């Protein structure tokens, strides 16, 4: 621990496992207390991987507490603005302030353009785009009230800079997040709040499960010209959650104090292919 985030509090969504858990543990190791939420329950029917569980969220709590930091956790859906606002309010009352927001929660669903239904399009947009907006709106005023600025990090995707074949809804939602970060940065900068988006490529999480990979492979059999659209420059195709957490922690720290409205890829170069 180097104390880069000492005396700060971070609000993290989708914190039960994967990238969200990695963000929580990494920030705790750097001295931050954590407000952690996750749906920890059933995901929409278009999602091909298992949802997180309350036990997953409890494990995140255990790992954060093992660092010696405090954590407030709650089972909350990012589509529930009032629920998020209540969790943040409770967390600030108990932990004293809010300095960092990490809007990490999101879903993906491999579907060809003509297989996407109005329901699945709405589900992906509601969780990824509206859920991100809800997250920022639930916490931004608390950062302002703290009086010393802060950092908001929106987790987009390589698809939010380029595109992901066979995921029109996911691509649209992640581009929305990219634009949202810039727009929030423009208005929140007067309060010394920085807002940036992070754009991972493939990451070793439940979202990258064998079922997901198999579904995409089936699609590329019928559209082979799209098979290599996200080929990386580096020899590593799949990052670990901790790799993304390194970047997110840096954006939360004073080391990135002059960086805002930036879209930062952590994608092994795949968005440039």
Regions of interest found by a model, annotated:
Residues 157:
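Residue(s) in the substrate-gating loop at a strand-loop-helix junction
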